[in-house]
């Protein structure tokens, strides 16, 4: 009896990993990306990035980003292509739903950011300030990263992977939004009040998650996320 129970547990765990290995691999890839694993690996071979001129250094970082994205796109090739077919088949409905979700997210994000800025007496979040500084230093690289790399990576982990791991719709939406919001706060954390910015970032994350649950099409939130980030980066580049 005990051995049978142990075998059942072992088989259940094995089957769970088989079903979810792509989502778990995505989380691992994101961890490696965030910790600059490939860059650190190259540094261990004696490459000093601080001595490399700006242009080739930025190019190396762009190649590093592309490697991760290519792996992800190959892993989820069927999902991406299926999403494109769905988008072609229901184009007008998908555009309308995407627009509604995006506008709702933007309204909540903008309103909550304004209220938080009044409370903290600062114009933008620390994360936003760091992004603006990076844009002023390397605008083309940041346009590439924010408009292509980040949307694909973030949607694959915070939407596609979490949706695959969490089977309950509204729990998934809340966890997706919360984790997405925390990502944009923890990296530039200076104090407890910074966690207030989880609300604006999390709200747009929840809207992207809701969009996925309504369509089961990961391509859609990726595209909306790309458009959203591209608009913001271009506004910063043009407006200075």
What positions do the PLM features span?
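Transmembrane helix-loop-helix hairpins at the membrane interface
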Residues: 107-110, 114, 118, 136-240
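Alpha-helical hydrophobic membrane-insertion segments
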Residues: 13-17, 24-28, 59-73, 92-96, ...
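Juxtamembrane "helix-exit" motif on the non-cytosolic side of transmembrane helices
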Residues: 37-49, 115-120, 185-189
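Interfacial transmembrane-helix boundary/kink motif in multi-pass membrane proteins
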Residues: 3-29, 53-58, 80-111, 167-168, ...
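Non-cytosolic membrane-interface motifs at loop->transmembrane helix junctions
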Residues: 52-58, 128-133, 192-203
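Alpha-helical transmembrane segments in multi-pass membrane proteins
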Residues: 21-79, 126-129, 141
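Juxtamembrane helix-loop-helix connectors linking adjacent transmembrane helices
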Residues: 47-55, 80-150, 237
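Gram-positive cell-envelope targeting signals
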Residues: 1-28, 32-40, 95, 141, ...
């Amino acid at each position: 009896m005990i051995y049978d129970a142990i075998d059942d547990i072992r088989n259940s765990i094995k089957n769970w990993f088989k079903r979810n290995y792509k989502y778990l691999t995505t989380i691992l890839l994101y961890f490696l990306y965030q910790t600059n694993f490939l860059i650190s690996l190259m540094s261990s071979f004696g490459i000093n990035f601080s001595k490399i001129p700006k242009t080739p250094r930025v190019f190396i970082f762009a190649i590093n980003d592309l490697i991760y994205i290519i792996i992800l796109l190959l892993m989820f090739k069927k999902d991406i292509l299926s999403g494109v077919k769905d988008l072609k088949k229901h184009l007008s409905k998908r555009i309308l739903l995407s627009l509604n979700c995006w506008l709702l997210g933007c309204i909540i994000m903008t309103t909550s950011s304004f209220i938080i800025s009044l409370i903290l007496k600062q114009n933008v979040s620390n994360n936003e300030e760091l992004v603006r500084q990076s844009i002023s230093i390397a605008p083309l690289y940041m346009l590439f990263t924010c408009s292509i790399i980040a949307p694909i990576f973030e949607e694959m982990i915070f939407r596609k992977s979490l949706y695959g791991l969490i089977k309950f719709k509204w729990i998934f939406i809340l966890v997706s939004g919360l984790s997405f919001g925390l990502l944009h706060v923890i990296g530039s954390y200076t104090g407890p009040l910074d966690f207030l910015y989880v609300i604006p970032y999390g709200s747009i994350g929840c809207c992207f998650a809701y969009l996925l649950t309504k369509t089961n099409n990961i391509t859609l939130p990726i595209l909306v996320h790309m458009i959203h980030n591209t608009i913001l980066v271009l506004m910063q580049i043009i407006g200075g």
